[in-house]
């Protein structure tokens, strides 16, 4: 049985995930008997999901097998009772917990790589599953020989082998294994693909399952191109604030095609460590809203995150992000430098003493300011509209008020005549 060994070196400590099924037992046997010269140390890991009575028999069998062959083994018993009780599917959660534990063991042992027994038939199954469940649009269509999970390396040395080759190898060497009868239950989608769809393809002389591999290769190349275009957009158009919000031009975003838009959003949520896996139909709804003519609105993402649309600006932000930093009011009694909601306020020493104390506060209904160089006053709210200030930013901008309740300055948008030499306000909110 010819497995690929270029995923590790002769000095490597390899960790092999073994379920006691025919695939993983054949891989373990092959590493012990045919490829023992390709690594320095081999350790076995096994997860007992505790969902079948036979699972404890399998655990005992593998423990004894490793003892006889002088292999270190680590076993994890998962408690999935909470998921089963809720009636939820356990497959994805069990996989997540398995691989997290594998990572813990690899870190503990300072091992180099985790080996799994995925093979070519598993690859066909994965491609079909992702295609027909809509999981292929923004993800790789299949598995790769090498990947990473939480910073540790996973390698699949049997990904080139057909199931029939593994069966022949097991039979020739009389390798002991256990059959998980749940693998025969066609209520699970992957089992149905494995037992019904793939055999039907193989039986039809006009069909060739290997064409799926060509599709995977083409798809992965195109996906990489999309990611590169999305990264270019992010590098050129997206600004990041020190509070981990991302903002960019609504117009520039609307000029992208839907595929690049989707990948841009994926990458930004990944950078925010949101752990979101948004379905394409949700993205399509968002993109339709972003294309409309409404000047300001919010798009609900999760209970913690929103997308704020403000004129030509699109902002991804935490819902609580603005409120938790907002100051409402401060009092200035002497010259100096002051901070107010990410704005820096510099009061010059030559500001007439009789003007103190100054009040710095956010806007209030009815606030007006005197127009420079002309008669009359203008509402602060109208200034914000004219300058296309976002709703959130309007709650942060400092107004400097004197004892007579006259507005001397409004953020970096306005300073009253005769005070420009004494009051300087700058917006530091976008500094990192």
Curated annotation (Swiss-Prot):
Q: What class of enzyme is it?
A: ligase
* A Pfam family reported for this protein in Swiss-Prot or TrEMBL: ATP_bind_3
Q: Which Gene Ontology cellular component annotation is one that this UniProt entry carries?
A: cytoplasm
Q: Name one GO molecular function term.
A: ATP binding
Its chief place of residence is cytoplasm
Residues reported in the UniProt entry to bind ATP:
19-24
UniProt KW Cytoplasm keyword: yes
> Entry's InterPro entries?
Lysidine-tRNA-synth_C, Rossmann-like_a/b/a_fold, TilS/TtcA_N, tRNA_Ile_lys_synt, tRNA_Ile_lys_synt_N
Q: Which SUPFAM superfamilies match?
A: Adenine nucleotide alpha hydrolases-like, PheT/TilS domain
Q: Which family does it belong to?
A: Belongs to the tRNA(Ile)-lysidine synthase family.
The record's annotation in PANTHER family points to:
TRNA(ILE)-LYSIDINE SYNTHASE-RELATED (PTHR43033:SF1)
**Domain-level remarks:** The N-terminal region contains the highly conserved SGGXDS motif, predicted to be a P-loop motif involved in ATP binding.
Protein name listed in UniProt = tRNA(Ile)-lysidine synthase
Gene behind the chain: tilS
């Amino acid at each position: 049985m010819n497995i690929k060994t270029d995923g590790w070196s002769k000095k490597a400590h390899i960790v092999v995930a073994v379920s006691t099924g025919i695939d993983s037992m054949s891989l373990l046997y092959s590493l012990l008997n045919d490829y023992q010269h390709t690594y320095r140390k081999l350790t076995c890991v096994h997860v007992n999901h505790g969902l079948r009575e036979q699972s404890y028999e399998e655990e005992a069998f593998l423990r004894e097998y490793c003892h006889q062959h002088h292999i270190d083994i680590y076993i994890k018993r998962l408690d999935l009772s909470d998921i089963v009780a809720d009636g939820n599917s356990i497959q994805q959660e069990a996989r997540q917990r398995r691989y997290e534990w594998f990572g813990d063991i690899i870190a503990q042992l300072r091992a180099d790589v985790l080996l799994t027994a995925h093979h070519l038939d598993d690859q066909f199954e994965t491609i079909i599953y992702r295609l027909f469940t809509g999981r292929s649009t923004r993800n790789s269509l299949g598995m790769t020989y090498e990947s990473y999970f939480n910073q540790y390396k996973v390698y699949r040395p049997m990904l080139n082998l057909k199931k029939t080759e593994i069966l022949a190898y097991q039979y020739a060497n009389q390798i002991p294994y256990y059959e998980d009868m749940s693998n025969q239950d066609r209520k699970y989608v992957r089992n149905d693909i494995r037992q019904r769809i793939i055999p039907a393809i193989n039986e039809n002389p006009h069909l060739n399952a290997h064409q799926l591999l060509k599709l995977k290769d083409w798809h992965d190349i195109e996906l990489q191109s999309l990611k590169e275009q999305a990264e270019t957009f992010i590098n050129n158009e997206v600004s990041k604030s020190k509070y981990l919000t991302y903002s960019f031009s609504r117009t520039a975003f609307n000029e992208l095609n839907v595929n690049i838009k989707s990948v841009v959003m994926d990458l930004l949520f990944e950078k925010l460590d949101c752990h979101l896996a948004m379905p394409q139909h949700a993205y399509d709804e968002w993109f339709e809203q972003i294309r409309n003519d409404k000047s300001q609105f919010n798009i609900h993402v999760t209970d913690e995150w929103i997308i704020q649309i403000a004129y030509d600006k699109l902002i991804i932000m935490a819902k609580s992000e603005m409120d938790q930093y907002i100051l409402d009011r401060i009092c200035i009694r002497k010259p100096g430098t002051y901070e107010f909601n990410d704005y820096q306020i510099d009061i010059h020493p030559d500001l007439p003493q009789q003007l103190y104390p100054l009040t710095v506060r956010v806007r209030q209904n009815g606030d007006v300011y005197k127009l420079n160089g002309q008669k009359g006053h203008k509402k602060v709210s109208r200034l914000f509209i004219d300058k296309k200030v976002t709703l959130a930013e309007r709650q942060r901008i400092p107004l400097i008020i004197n004892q007579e309740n006259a507005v001397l300055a409004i953020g970096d948008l306005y300073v009253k005549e005769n005070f420009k030499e004494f009051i300087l306000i700058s917006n530091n909110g976008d500094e990192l």
